[in-house]
Amino acid sequence: MLQETRPLVRALRREGFRVQVETNGTRECPVGVDWLTVSPKPPRFAVQPGLVGKAREVKLVVSRELTLAAVRAVRRRFPVSTPLILQPHGMAAWSMKKAWRLLVEAGRRGWPNIRLMVQLHKVLKIK
């Protein structure tokens, strides 16, 4: 992570809060988070090896660059028990259609634990 979040995570945990962090996965994550989401970015979808077993979910934004081969590569990198979530880019119709096609094709090929979820902050227009 680019920001130094360890002091914040420690302070929140001391006060009894649970901590969820979403990261692109290119750097290690602070110790003590309760839920880690990894959202790797194209074109390489690089993820630090130490995060692979810690991630509770993996999110892929369905961009124009996202391919079925990339979905397969990311799915193979993480444990089957870790959900891989396809998220359409905002409310863009092309991205929703592409996300659905990727989900259906992944299902046809028997790739496990792949889901579809909207980016709620985009739907609600929260910046």
Regions found by a protein language model. Give the residues of each.
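Conserved AdoMet/S-adenosylmethionine-binding subsite of the radical SAM
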Residues: 1-127
